[in-house]
Amino acid sequence: MPSIHPSIDNGITKGNPNFKGGKLYCHCPTRKVEVTLASNVAHNHACGCSKCWKPKGALFSVVGVVPKDAVSVTANGDKLHIIDESAAIQRNACKECGVHLFGRIVVDHPFKGLDFVHTELSPQKGWQEPQFAAFVSSIIEQGFKPSEMDAVREKFRKVGLQPYDVLSPALMDLIATYTAQKSGKLPSKL
């Protein structure tokens, strides 16, 4: 089976709940884009969607969220560009190496105010470990054989990650709550 993700293939390393953040770097040999995160990530997960940046040969990305106010570009920001300005998550990638450093939501959205980041781009240890796998079936859209999907889901379960074809139940509940509040079916403050 191809690599799920380098940080998952051989088991998951537990993060440090007291970890305070670190720096992310693009893959350029010189003039690396540097992004500083002033907090640990939350909801870190394997993602099979076709939009997320993935390491070479990996079927999934590993991506978590941090408050947007905890994200700052601290070196070579001139090398960043937004991959698709029409997407809900505006992925800021290095123009030279293509690595996505952070994704920001600027439209009205349940996750607005949170930035999506790939902690594998950090040399620091202690980031929250992946909590679940999302959009698992989406790897089929990228050419993965449907007949091999059971093995992918079993690999996730074997390392302790629940595979979902959407987000985790807690995140789906947040989206549904946001939608109900916007429509007036629930009060704006619960």
Swiss-Prot record:
Disulfide bonds: none annotated. The keyword Lipid metabolism does not apply. Zn(2+) 2 binds at residues 47, 49, 52. Gene3D superfamilies: glutathione-dependent formaldehyde- activating enzyme (gfa) (3.90.1590.10). The keyword Lyase applies. InterPro entries: CENP-V/GFA, Formald_GSH, Mss4-like_sf. Its EC number is 4.4.1.22. Its cofactor is Zn(2+). It catalyses: S-(hydroxymethyl)glutathione = glutathione + formaldehyde. One of its GO terms (biological process) is formaldehyde catabolic process. It comes from the Eukaryota. Residues 19-165 form the CENP-V/GFA domain. Coiled coil: none annotated. Binds 2 Zn(2+) ions per subunit. Keywords: Lyase, Metal-binding, Zinc. Pathway: One-carbon metabolism; formaldehyde degradation; formate from formaldehyde (glutathione route): step 1/3. One of its GO terms (molecular function) is S-(hydroxymethyl)glutathione synthase activity. Zn(2+) 1 binds at residues 26, 28, 94, 97. NCBIfam families: formald_GSH (TIGR02820), PRK05417.1 (NF003829). HAMAP family: Formald_GSH (MF_00723). Catalyzes the condensation of formaldehyde and glutathione to S-hydroxymethylglutathione. Belongs to the Gfa family. PANTHER family: CENP-V_GFA DOMAIN-CONTAINING PROTEIN-RELATED (PTHR33337:SF40), GFA DOMAIN-CONTAINING PROTEIN (PTHR33337). This is Putative glutathione-dependent formaldehyde-activating enzyme. It comes from Pyrenophora tritici-repentis (strain Pt-1C-BFP) (Wheat tan spot fungus). The lineage of its organism: Eukaryota, Fungi, Dikarya, Ascomycota, Pezizomycotina.
